[in-house]
Amino acid sequence: MAVKERVGVVVSDKMDKTVVVAIENRSPHPKYGKIVVKTQKFKAHDAENQAKQGDRVRIRETRPLSKTKRWEVAEILTDS
């Protein structure tokens, strides 16, 4: 099974070793064709607390680390 990876923006870094990453999905409306932007938020494990709010990061799926945390920060793409 392939490892799932996604790219998003850190919207919160207030928790210890955890960041909240927002990922935008753009798709056309099935009937009207207008581009609709849907945002999903994922909690991701950041072991060294390196990611800051506004950073663009790549996250990868991992085993469940807590009740809501199933992703980890793979790399920081751009700094805020």
Swiss-Prot record:
Domain of life of the organism encoding this protein: Bacteria
GO cellular component terms attached to this protein's record: cytosolic small ribosomal subunit
GO molecular function: rRNA binding; structural constituent of ribosome
Pfam families: Ribosomal_S17
UniProt keyword annotations, A-Z: Ribonucleoprotein, Ribosomal protein, RNA-binding, rRNA-binding
One annotated GO biological process: translation
Family: Belongs to the universal ribosomal protein uS17 family.
Known partners and oligomeric status: Part of the 30S ribosomal subunit.
Function: One of the primary rRNA binding proteins, it binds specifically to the 5'-end of 16S ribosomal RNA.
Protein name: Small ribosomal subunit protein uS17
Organism: Microcystis aeruginosa (strain NIES-843 / IAM M-2473)
